[in-house]
Amino acid sequence: MISINIVGEVDSILIESILELDRRITINSSNIDPNFIIVYEKFDEYYTFLKEFIGKIPIVIITGNTSYSRKCYFYSLGIDLYIIKNNESKSLILCRILNEIKKYIKYVNDDFIDFENHQFVFNNYLVNLSNIELKILRCLYINLGRYVSKEELKKGVWDTEDFVDSNTINVYIHRLRDSLKNCKEIEIINERKLGYKILIRKDLC
């Protein structure tokens, strides 16, 4: 799942165009943490909100604030795209936003898991994994943006809830994290009682 949040002005044409890009995309879901944020602002009303997410996930700002120093400041923080509304047409703004989303989708496609050769490939980073580790990785990926419980992993990886205890899952998650430790763009986090979640960070591998 690719969760995109649109903050501020909501453009129906933009929403339709985004949803056409990939069937996995959801917009403004209350159940999934965002993987990508688009902010429409008049001047500076989302400054605090933006600082919380910049550098963690891709962010696009479309603003009426014409300050060049502010634009430079946000790029220095790691913003992905900063568009001043008055400088560009609506159609061009739409194209630029969609192109940025396409770049992100490229990072989260299924192609990085090669079951036949037991390999994981991401941004030129390659590691050999066991079949179980690959299945866990894929199970976390297809649920991108939300926690996957141990019960879900048992069903998705082992196709059973029997004969697989929590310790077995913990061991495989530990091995998977250890195998991926050199790829800083991929992180597996866990939350007590919720399960495990995969984070894909941009431009770090």
Curated annotation (Swiss-Prot):
Keywords: DNA-binding, Plasmid, Transcription, Transcription regulation. GO terms for molecular function: DNA binding. The keyword NAD does not apply. The keyword DNA-binding applies. GO terms for biological process: phosphorelay signal transduction system; regulation of DNA-templated transcription. It comes from the Bacteria. Residues 103-200 bind DNA. To the C-terminus of E.coli phosphate regulon transcriptional regulatory protein PhoB. This is Putative epidermin response regulator. It comes from Staphylococcus epidermidis. The gene is epiQ.
